[in-house]
Design a protein with these regions (language model features):
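Small cysteine-rich, disulfide-bonded extracellular modules of the LU/uPAR three-finger superfamily
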Residues: 1-108, 115-155
């Protein structure tokens, strides 16, 4: 099996239940004008992350190595979700950067998840060409925040 890129099914259900707060302008039931903290964790090429991955807690085979913190890095959402036509979209406002890491086991997936939520609910799985890093920086550059290329899109 392999990692498969997808917006997770559990995230779609979470949207109806107002589980996630991507910015401080919305007030879901679990917060009071406070944005949740989202994180991006890297997973090995031997993982099987996909649309059915419900949480960070339930995912296995996260990478490990010098300079890498379990759970990954914080993702910055500096702009509010938006929409154009029939598509809503949201993209982190900065690249996702893992600085000065050594990751010798091949990895090819990133799990975006809600670190504020007790269950560490998943949002999406993103895949890329398998990588290793030797005492370097691994950067995931974010696309333009629009209805065509935004990182999270719902049409």
């Amino acid at each position: 099996m392999a990692n498969t890129q997808a917006m997770t099914t559990s995230f779609k259900v979470d949207l109806f239940n107002a589980v996630h707060a991507f910015n401080a302008t919305g007030i879901p039931a679990h917060t009071v004008s406070t944005a949740d903290q989202f994180k991006a964790a890297l997973f090995t090429a031997a993982s099987t992350l996909n649309a059915s991955t419900t949480s960070f807690t339930g995912a296995t085979t996260e990478v490990s190595g010098a300079g890498y913190s379990t759970g990954g890095v914080v993702v910055t959402f500096g702009t509010a979700p938006s929409s154009t036509g029939t598509t809503s979209f949201l993209t982190p406002s900065a690249s996702i950067v893992y600085s000065t890491v050594t990751l010798s086991v091949s990895f090819d997936a990133m799990l975006l998840y809600n670190n504020t939520n007790t269950g560490k609910n998943s949002v999406a799985v993103y895949t890329f060409t398998a990588q290793t890093v030797a005492a370097g920086t691994f950067t995931l550059t974010m696309p333009v925040n629009d209805a065509t290329t935004g990182l999270l899109r719902i049409a």
